[in-house]
From Swiss-Prot:
Protein known as: Gap junction beta-2 protein
Impact reported for H73R: In PPKDFN; the mutant has a dominant-negative effect on connexin trafficking
One GO cellular component term noted in the UniProt record for this chain: connexin complex
Species whose genome carries this gene: Homo sapiens
Effect of V153I: May contribute to deafness
């Protein structure tokens, strides 16, 4: 599945989201997926080929690169976007299932008085209530967990969010401690900080939406007659 397909699927979820959820999807598309596809790949490029060490020992450069960059930044961000987007796909599946059930009941004649035809069922805005509320709320909760987990993994794996210009490596088969140089470290640091900052904004939006849904749920409960 490419990014265009993912955008199409999540665009369908956007119709059933809250206003805060729509802002989150906009940030996800413009500031994360578009930046990752258009700009970040150009900055990183073939990063292993641009990783230079002051030794001719066969295998030393590859081992040092693998030690300092066990997973490419691009691939880690792509994996993060997949994990963060997956809960939203569950909401889309739930909405599709609910519409399928309404179509089935309409064909059987159980709810013919509620809809004119099947097309009206397809275009009906689905309200976030009942079991869909739990699915939607759970999806937001897991998005926050995935975002925070990947930010932590990123920080631990790369020892911070800034890209070092020079790294020293003494892993085998290097004959001694060698100096290795990272290409375009400043540009990569800027992109890294930007992506982390956008992840933080997404977490803030998700937490805000979660609080909004919980408050609306509690106020709806309190209005019900005892």
């Amino acid at each position: 599945m490419d990014w265009g397909t993912l955008q199409t699927i999540l665009g369908g979820v956007n119709k059933h989201s809250t206003s805060i959820g729509k802002i989150w999807l906009t940030v996800l598309f413009i500031f994360r997926i578009m930046i990752l596809v258009v700009a970040a790949k150009e900055v990183w490029g073939d990063e292993q080929a641009d990783f230079v060490c002051n030794t001719l020992q066969p295998g030393c450069k590859n081992v040092c690169y693998d030690h300092y960059f066990p997973i490419s930044h691009i691939r880690l961000w792509a994996l993060q976007l997949i994990f963060v987007s997956t809960p939203a796909l569950l909401v889309a599946m739930h909405v599709a299932y609910r519409r399928h059930e309404k179509k089935r009941k309409f064909i059987k004649g159980e709810i013919k008085s509620e809809f004119k035809d099947i097309e009206e069922i397809k275009t009906q805005k689905v309200r976030i209530e009942g079991s869909l509320w739990w699915t939607y709320t759970s999806s937001i909760f897991f998005r926050v967990i995935f975002e925070a987990a990947f930010m932590y993994v990123f920080y631990v794996m790369y020892d911070g969010f800034s890209m070092q210009r020079l790294v020293k490596c003494n892993a085998w088969p290097c004959p001694n401690t060698v100096d290795c140089f990272v290409s375009r470290p400043t540009e990569k640091t800027v992109f890294t900080v930007f992506m982390i900052a956008v992840s933080g904004i997404c977490i803030l939006l998700n937490v805000t939406e979660l609080c909004y849904l919980l408050i609306r749920y509690c106020s709806g409960k309190s209005k019900k007659p005892v």
